[in-house]
Amino acid sequence: MKDSHQTIGVFVRPTHYQNPLFKELEQAKEWVLKLLEDEGFESFMIDSLDGAKDERLIEKADAFLCLGGDGTILGALRMTHSYNKPCFGVRIGNLGFLSAVELNGLKDFLQDLKQDRIKLEEHLALEGRIGNTSFYAINEIVIAKKKALGVLDIKAYAGHTPFNTYKGDGLIIATPLGSTAYNLSAHGPIVHALSQSYILTPLCDFSLTQRPLVLGAEFCLNFCTHEDALVVIDGQSTYDLKANQPLYIQKSPTTTKLLQKNSRDYFKVLKEKLLWGESPSKKR
């Protein structure tokens, strides 16, 4: 067993007892902790997704198991991002696009992990800053209207060079890993998850000529709006953006690290999870 993965922190998003998955998650938590012990791993539970509260636990772990869906994985990845440690997802719930394995395949995955038969994928992440507040995004940063009515003007700059003004409901700045999330729903392009780029996809733009734009990750971007707006991180947290206040976005110096099976193939995942390339009439 490699020393680098001896201690596993287990993330579980807190779930209300009325949630249909509550009972399944409660049972799975105990089973996972027992399995980790049986396979020779030290483990502990992190079930608050509160970075300040769990900082010492995060420092203790060598890797993190995320029990749940993609939302749980995204929250854990952001919380652990600055610690430069890998996560892997065990799917319970819906899509599970980022997950490494189903619950019934976890034992085999852990055995492969002990034998170093697991691959480490490193993905581009975004680092954003508003004033003195910095944050990371795994899938996307969205600039959105605060008001239900009207059009939001967003001026976009690459460094100090203005390159576009978006007029609409908002703008998605996505990572390649996040290109299959909100970006895809907004008719943005699928970009291979290991690419080094940003995807800028306008939301309900007022102009017929506006189209999604893919930029190299070497650019430092900044944006400002003509009125107060919201900045949404991975669909899970929000920040206020004041009128004419700059939002700076650049490639994070630390990558998003996911442990995956050696057999995982990106294009196969697209077909299985999103029915990519399938006929609309074909049933799953």
UniProtKB/Swiss-Prot annotation:
- What are its E.C. numbers? 2.7.1.23
Query: Where is NAD(+) bound in this sequence?
Result: 70-71, 139-140, 167, 169, 177, 180-185, 236
Concerning Gene3D superfamilies, the annotation shows: Probable inorganic polyphosphate/atp-NAD kinase, domain 1, Probable inorganic polyphosphate/atp-NAD kinase, domain 2
Query: Which branch of life, at top level?
Result: Bacteria
Q: Which UniProt keywords apply?
A: ATP-binding, Cytoplasm, Kinase, NAD, NADP, Nucleotide-binding, Transferase
Catalytic residues at 70
> Where found, per UniProt?
Cytoplasm
A biological-process GO annotation: NAD metabolic process
Q: What class of enzyme is it?
A: transferase
A molecular function (GO) held by this record is:
NAD binding
Stored Pfam families: NAD_kinase, NAD_kinase_C
Q: Name the GO cellular-component terms.
A: cytoplasm
**Do you know which InterPro entries this protein is assigned to?**
ATP-NAD_kinase_N, ATP-NAD_kinase_PpnK-typ_C, NAD/diacylglycerol_kinase_sf, NADK
Q: Which cofactor does it need?
A: a divalent metal cation
Q: Which reaction does it catalyse?
A: NAD(+) + ATP = ADP + NADP(+) + H(+)
Residue runs in coiled coils? none
The protein's job, in short, is: Involved in the regulation of the intracellular balance of NAD and NADP, and is a key enzyme in the biosynthesis of NADP. Catalyzes specifically the phosphorylation on 2'-hydroxyl of the adenosine moiety of NAD to yield NADP.
Q: Which family does it belong to?
A: Belongs to the NAD kinase family.
The protein's name: NAD kinase
Query: What is the scientific name of the source organism?
Result: Helicobacter pylori (strain P12)
